[in-house]
Amino acid sequence: PLVYHDNSLTKDVLNYTDGDKFDVVLMNPPYGGNEKSDVKSHFPSDMRSSETADLFMVLIMYRLKRNGRAAVIVPDGFLFGADNTKIAIKTKLLRDFNLHTIIRLPGSIFAPYTSIATNILFFDNTCAEGAPEGYSTKETWFYRLDMPEGYKHFSKTKSMKSEHCDPIREWWNDRKEIIIADGDEKSRCYSVEDLIATDCNFDLCKFPKEDEEILPPAELLADYFKKRKALDHEIDKTLAEIQRILGINVNVDEL
């Protein structure tokens, strides 16, 4: 494959030709960074965001071939961002592309490398059948991937596995709205008119907020002593092993 070591954001997006475009784009662009004015100048004036992830979204839209497909990971901030630049980018996405699916991912999915909550946007460079005039998107499905049973969060030792995506695969081929107790929407389909009416707020089918449990002081202290005892035991085991390896014996009582 042809691989170029370069900054993809330093070329004027309006100068790309069909030969520069792709049939498929799969990307997890960098997010959290800020770009300088000389980089932003390569983008249309209404989409000159300082955020790297926003500019990559614009770049992808300009480099996806007609009938091409894209799957892009974006941070939560892109979904709920309400500044004029983000609204312009998301409006272009709905007008010029068929944004058919958004998957909400668990917040710790990329732990320990980042705790930023992320999502996958699936869209095609096509016009959906029945889309209203002026738009290529007719409707967008949202699906929330909850943490698998037995997991509070992902980590380096308990990372996400392929089978944890099975609920997405099952739902993908048999799409239906899923509403849990108390109106908690796990999956729902929104029309493009619905999305435009909210100024392109894509922060839908959100993860429910967890209520913080506040224990009584006696329980907090008991839990602390229990954990400290377990930690002291592990430290004693480690120190004993070190003494065995070094062939020494330190009498702690004499210290």
Label for each model-derived stretch:
Residues 1:
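Short, conserved SAM-binding/catalytic segment
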Residues 5, 10-255:
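A conserved structural/catalytic subdomain of Rossmann-like adenosyl-cofactor enzymes
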